[in-house]
Amino acid sequence: AAGQDNFMRF
């Protein structure tokens, strides 16, 4: 989940 959230922040 953390990786997906980071991608969305980009």
UniProtKB/Swiss-Prot annotation:
Localization (cell): Secreted
GO cellular component: extracellular region
Main subcellular location: secreted
Keyword Secreted part of the UniProt annotation: yes
Positions where Phenylalanine amide occurs in the chain: F10
Name the UniProt record assigns to this protein: CalliFMRFamide-12
Domain of life of the source: Eukaryota
GO biological process: neuropeptide signaling pathway
Alphabetical keyword list: Amidation, Neuropeptide, Secreted
Family per record: Belongs to the FARP (FMRFamide related peptide) family.
